[in-house]
Amino acid sequence: MEKIRKNKIYKNIYELNINFGKSKSNKNISENYIFNGRSVSAICFNRKLKIFYFIQQFRPNYFFNKFKVKPLEIVAGGIKRNESSRQAINREINEELGVTAVSLKKIDSLIIAPDCLEEITDVYLAEVPVIKKFEINNPKEGEFIKIISLKKNEALELVNKKSTQNLVTKYALLKIRDIKI
């Protein structure tokens, strides 16, 4: 059985000292770990118009890797201290789409990239009202968002494209196949 000792190095950075058993032949390792906390994501749709809402905003990683700098994404963000997952996704939908969700259902939890980015995101299905304003500017958060509406068949066409996409949005596009609106 492993014994794990955790030493805080700085804010959310830890050194983990791991012993993989009782015998002397077992390995002891030391590994640095960045705890990114938890986040939320939402597949947002409007039942009346039969559309899904996505967002586009500047992403430095896409810029440095010479991809399209404003990738298509689903609504997502971090969970703040003393905030529940449900409160966080409601806040993110309001910040990024400018509306309040009509209904919310948690459908999954995903570890984004084990051993690299240990962040866990809770994925929700969110019915939202018709959106009339398609740009959201939130300078305090560094967000200048363009809202994109897609019909189900348009969203499904993106599944077959071989373009680089973030994991959670790719997951959402695959889940849209099963969603009946």
Feature roles, as predicted:
Residues 21, 46-49, 58, 127-131, ...:
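Short loop segments at secondary-structure junctions
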Residues 14-24, 113-133:
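Active-site-adjacent beta-strand/loop module that shapes the phosphate/pyrophosphate-binding cleft
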Residues 13-15, 43, 54, 123-125, ...:
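Conserved hydrophobic/aromatic beta-strand scaffold that supports enzyme active sites
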Residues 68-72, 81, 140-181:
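Nudix hydrolase/Nudix homology domain
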